[in-house]
Amino acid sequence: MPPRDSGPDVTHADFDAEPAWTPPSWEQIVEEHSPRVYRLAYRLSGNRHDAEDLTQETFVRVFRSLSSYQPGTFEGWLHRITTNLFLDSARRKSRIRFEALGEDDGARLVTPSGRGTPERGFEHQNLDYDVQAALDALSPEYRAAVVLCDIEGLSYEEIAATLGIKMGTVRSRIHRARAQLRSALAHRAQSVEVG
């Protein structure tokens, strides 16, 4: 004899079913996740304007794809979208190389009053110029892997899923990126030893 239910219309599926996922509002998504998406976009792109564009593109993509989102790690999904958009952009720009401004050129960009914009102040307080310049010198694939690992704190498994590559490739890219970063930042270690 089957077990009795607590009511005539109740089935075991009713007890096992999870509540339906309700997508958050557009405002909730942007308010909660924009600082993290912008930080990732800035570290990947290396400048404020590209980071703003990448952040905007990410949220446009999220808005278009939210109905097909399968509940899981929302932050991981945002990382994947942001990183893939960055890599797509880097591939499109691969034929054109832009040279970074030298230290002497930067002095010409200071506002006449001698003060920078609020964004520039934030960057100077929170982002290290040498580290960002070293990140910018990496290939987009290496940069994405090392930023996701060392700055965003993702595991190798999460990076592999985000980038759609094998775990061995993740390890290799991170190892090579770190070696290039060590080489690019070697002058800092020497100045610490001297000082």
Where do the protein language model's features map onto the residues?
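Short helix-capping/turn signature of helix-turn-helix
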Residues: E32-S34, R43-L44, V147-L154
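Acidic, proline/glycine-rich intrinsically disordered inter-domain spacer in sigma factors
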Residues: H12-D16, P24, Q28, G106-D136
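Arg/Lys-rich amphipathic alpha helix in sigma70-family domain 2
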Residues: T83-L101, V110, G116, H124, ...
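Residues within the DNA-recognition helix of helix-turn-helix
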Residues: H33, D130, R173-Q180
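A short, charge-rich alpha-helical start-of-domain segment used by transcription regulators
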Residues: D16-R39, H49-E52
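Structural recognition of an alpha-helix C-terminal capping motif at a helix-to-coil junction
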Residues: R39, D53-V60, R64, T73-N84
